[in-house]
Structure formats: structure tokens, C-alpha cells
Amino acid sequence: MQSLVILGATGSIGASTLNVVKCNHEQYRVFALVANTNVAKMLEICIEHRPLVAHMVNAQAATELKRLLPSELAIEVTTGEDELLSLVSCAEVDTVMAAIVGAAGLPSTLAAVKAGKRVLLANKESLVMSGQLFIEAMQSSGATVLPVDSEHNAIFQCLSERTQLEIGRCDLAGAGISHILLTGSGGPFLNSELSTLSSMTPAQACKHPNWSMGQKISVDSASMMNKGLEYIEARWLFNASAEQLKVVIHPQSVIHSMVQYRDGSVIAQLGNPDMRTPIAHCMSFPQRISSGVEPLDFFKVGQLSFLEPDFNRFPCLALAIEACKQGQEATTVLNAANEISVQAFLEGQIRFTDIAIINEQSFKHVTAQSLTTIDDIMALDSQARQYALEAVNKLK
């Protein structure tokens, strides 16, 4: 029985993970649940899943949870950064679902990697920010990292067994691979008039045509920054060059990504757009378990279509690709700026089209020396956030 820690337990990925656990309760034990401030949701899932530990990042939320939890459950409530890092490194823990959104998830995800855990990586920002440091930590500790993002999980499933064992140091050309084809739906504004994008609301941006996701990733999907971050993540996970990575718009979200081989073959992974499928795959790899997802009905799908991305419509995607070419400093800055600009948009402070403007300004103006430690990364992240906040204030 695997002992599981879920980072970001009250979020969308956390809920899907617990759903898969429920379908396979004889194989998994929830050792700990980790959340930030959502006490009501944490209380609900603690009562249902009975973890040994419930960790709240917010100290006030931890106090409130401790007060509300029935004492007979004997769940230990903890808070604090050191306690969280100790929790993911605990000898009793086998697997860590890394699903805290954004830069906030980097320290705990990296701690799990350094502890040699089986890490189910849903926090793409960890690789976007720490890249080489992350890969080096994984190789040094012997940690197993499995990609949860549907696209990267699809790519992983399309690789040979040998290449699957070489995450972070894959030799794609040696495996006969010519291109990784990263698919994306194009989001809710794919067919909107360009002139209307500046007036799009947070509610419209969060109404994804195919996926049910949290607010931040929904806005990122609307701008295709999410695909840009996934492009950067794919670069590190699969040791891919810019020439080996291509983005393909696929509005139906049925093909989750593809791998093109030298001999002309293209292998694709298909399925209904439901995160429980890649989560179940990662949790059980190399075996297969039930995810609770309905099988794909090809007769209902009807057609599959593909488009080249329009960078005039999706400038954030172009920025991310350029940042990936420039290196770690650029991707760290872009990620930080995007978190600030998206939050400002969600709060009604800026227009949807201002997200790309702020991201580009930050990308061009915030610079740093080489990043050799996690402290270097977090310092640059903080610097980029401050610049982006100032840019937001100028646009209000």
C-alpha cells in the first residue's frame, strides 16, 4: 500500500487525486493532506479520508482547523515551512502529489525530490523556475518524477520504456524521435475577434470549453501562457531542444499530445479531458488502475481538427517560447510576472490583454546573474513580482 502526501489537497488536482484514491482505496493510504487557507474544504476531506496529518500553510487556518476537527479522528494539524518540508521528506511517505499552484509549490516539491520520493508533478512552475537544479536534484537523489499535466503525461506514455526511465536526460534523437507535438485547445477565445479580447472578463476567461480547472490555470489557458509554461516544462522533462518541440492547437482536447518518430510514425495518447486519467496513470505506473473516467466514445467525438498557433492572438505563448530559448533566468521572471498579472486580471485591476503587456515588460527589464541555488531563484522571483506589481499599478 502506497503512503501518499497531497500538496494542494483542496484544489482541482487534489480533488481529482482523492477521487482516484477512493476508487482504489485498497492500494493507497492518505498520509497527509496539505492546503493553504481553505479550512472548510480541508475539514471535509479530512473527515472523509482520515489522513494522519493535515498541514495548513496559513497558521490562522491551522488553528481554526484544529478547533473544528473531531478529536476522535486523532489527526495531527501542523503549520510552518519547516514542518511542511519535513512532512514531504518523512520516511513513512512513498509518494508526493505536487499540486500546489505557482511558485509557492517549488520549495516543497523540490524537498520531495531531494528526499528521493516518487513525485507526481502537477506543479509545472517548479520546472519552469528551477529547471536544471530540479533535474540535478532528481538525478542525485534517485527520485522518480512522473508528469501529471495531461500533455506531458501523454508524451510520457508515447515514449519507449527505456526513454521513460531517462526523464530529465532523455536522448530523443537516439530514441528515433524527431518532434514532440504539444497540443492545446486554444481556450475559450480561440475564435473570438481580436478586437474583443481587451474587454473579456475573468468569468469568460475561466469558462474553458473542455476542461474543469482552477481560476489561474483557466486564465493561463485563455492566454495560452499555460501552453507556454508546458513548453518550458517539456524542455526539461524530456531534454528537448527548441527544434524538437512544436505546439499544435487541437480544439477538441481529445489528443493530449503526440510524439513524431523519424520513420514517419506519430504516436498519440487520446482520452476524455479529465485529469483523473493522467493522475491514475502516475499513481500506478507502470501498472494501470481505475480512474473513474468514462472511456472515450469515438462515435461521439466525430472529428479531430488541428491549427497552427497564431502568435498575434496568443502573445504569451510566443513570450514563453522565447524565454525558454534564453534560459532559466528568463523563464523564472516570466513565470513570476504572469502570476502577478493573472491575479490582477482576476481581481478586475487590468484588462485581459494587459497580461501579455505586463509579462513582456517584466521579461525585458528584470535581469539576473546565473541562478545556482534555490535562494537565487526565489530572489529573482521576488524581484520580478515587484516589477510586475508596479506595472499593474501603472495600468490601473
Swiss-Prot record:
Enzyme Commission designation: 1.1.1.267
Gene3D superfamilies hit by this protein: 1.10.1740.10, NAD(P)-binding Rossmann-like Domain (3.40.50.720)
Binding site for 1-deoxy-D-xylulose 5-phosphate: 124, 150-151, 185, 208, 221, 226-227, 230
UniProt record, GO biological process: isopentenyl diphosphate biosynthetic process, methylerythritol 4-phosphate pathway involved in terpenoid biosynthetic process
MF term (GO), any: manganese ion binding
Binding-site positions, NADPH: 10-13, 38, 123, 125, 214
Catalytic activity: 2-C-methyl-D-erythritol 4-phosphate + NADP(+) = 1-deoxy-D-xylulose 5-phosphate + NADPH + H(+)
Coiled coil: none
Cofactor section: Mg(2+); Mn(2+)
Pathway: Isoprenoid biosynthesis; isopentenyl diphosphate biosynthesis via DXP pathway; isopentenyl diphosphate from 1-deoxy-D-xylulose 5-phosphate: step 1/6
Keywords, alphabetical: Isoprene biosynthesis, Manganese, Metal-binding, NADP, Oxidoreductase
The keyword Magnesium appears for this protein: no
Taxonomy, superkingdom: Bacteria
InterPro entries per record: DXP_reductoisomerase (IPR003821), DXP_reductoisomerase_C (IPR013644), DXP_reductoisomerase_N (IPR013512), DXPR_C (IPR026877), DXPR_C_sf (IPR036169), NAD(P)-bd_dom_sf (IPR036291)
Positions that bind Mn(2+): 149, 151, 230
Enzyme superclass (EC): oxidoreductase
Family: Belongs to the DXR family.
Function: Catalyzes the NADPH-dependent rearrangement and reduction of 1-deoxy-D-xylulose-5-phosphate (DXP) to 2-C-methyl-D-erythritol 4-phosphate (MEP).
NCBIfam families: Dxr, PRK05447.1-1, PRK12464.1
Protein known as: 1-deoxy-D-xylulose 5-phosphate reductoisomerase
